[in-house]
Amino acid sequence: FNRVINGCWQLSAEHCLQGHLDYDDAIRAFHELVEQGFTTFDCADIYTGAEEVLGRFVMDLKGSGHYQEEDIQIHTKFVPDKDVLPVINMKYTEGIVDRSLKRMHREALDLVQFHWWDFDVPGMMETAFDLVKLQEKGKIHNIGMCNMDTNALKQMVDAGIPVVSNQAQYSVFDRRPERTLLDYSAEHGIYTFAYGTLAGGFLAER
């Protein structure tokens, strides 16, 4: 993956400033990014439309003959709905992963980043192990975490979940990861993927 990752949060209609997005413009922008060497994209199952537009982009690349599927890395997320947390099961988890595979026209997901809305709700570890089972089935290459604090990340590591990354908000304004998270992650070979580094455009618009 690249050290600079192309975030796709704003592809979601809910997050787009204009209220809608011209997907053709987005795909053209993706092509320009790849031509400049920025080949890693970050999205999520809950970014409405983001996985679909990345899927169209993947098909465009395949059709061009200039790139192989492995030349592009797509990181997605598994974010179970809050009301599902108390009753989540393997069927639900596999269904979401299968949907992401279909949307993005991939044989396997490069990285699935697991987010759990409320650490007080039981089921987080069981769901993480379900992702491991899907990895063993070949549907997921790598498992990462999203917005896990140090304690939650430690639970994953201690339980043997093969965590390769954790995405966390980190900027000159929000330096919470420096307390314990960055050091713990580094000690265990876990990459930290920072988002919000420009504070949503407050620090710089470009």
Description of each model-found segment:
Residues 6, 33, 41, 54, ...:
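Conserved, mostly hydrophobic/aromatic
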Residues 10-24, 78-94, 116-122:
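Active-site mouth loops of central-metabolism enzymes
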Residues 19-33, 86-105, 149-155:
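Short, acidic/polar
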Residues 44-53, 81-86, 118-122, 171-176:
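Acidic-and-aromatic substrate-binding clefts and catalytic sites of carbohydrate-active enzymes
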Residues 68-82, 112:
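A short, structured active-site edge motif that brings together acidic residues
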Residues 101-123:
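Active-site groove signature of glycoside hydrolases
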Residues 117-206:
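Beta/alpha (TIM)-barrel catalytic core signal, keyed to glycine-rich beta->alpha loops juxtaposed to Asp/Glu
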